[in-house]
A protein has these predicted regions:
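PLP-dependent amino-acid enzyme catalytic core
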Residues: 1-127
Length: 127
């Protein structure tokens, strides 16, 4: 088993963003970090595919702290953090998350069996 702490996840988010301008969400950053730890322990360079199936907009507080420093999100509303994240990464919040700006937690949408591809294409605006 591999464990990954919040500081490592935040560090990976910032490192990838600084190098590529890509805002990696915390869950995917955790998966990538766990893979890197496992690979280093095995002492092998095994290629992997890690799918990014989430959005940084589900984790605006974590994203703000990763990109702007620990404690940055304290006292700021989700609405403000979302606006700042949109400006920082140059990507508008997807419609699926826009109505959730005032909620503390954002549930994932439910997708019916056999409709995953269609749902992803719709969310990307290409269906």
């Amino acid at each position: 088993a591999v464990t990954v702490d919040d500081r490592r996840i935040s560090g990976l988010i910032l490192s990838i963003y600084d190098r590529t301008d890509y805002a990696l969400d915390p869950q995917t950053a955790g998966a990538l970090s766990a893979y890197e730890t496992w690979r280093d322990r095995q002492k092998i360079d095994l290629p992997a595919v890690i799918l990014n199936l989430d959005s940084p907009y589900r984790f605006v507080q974590t994203m703000a702290e990763a990109l702007r420093g620990r404690g940055y999100a304290r006292g700021r509303s989700r609405k403000v953090l979302i606006s700042e994240l949109e400006q920082e990464i140059g990507l508008a919040i997807p419609d699926i998350f826009s109505h959730m700006a005032e909620q503390d937690t954002i549930p994932l949408p439910t997708v019916k069996k056999g409709e995953l591809s269609k749902t992803i294409l719709e969310q990307l605006g290409i269906a």
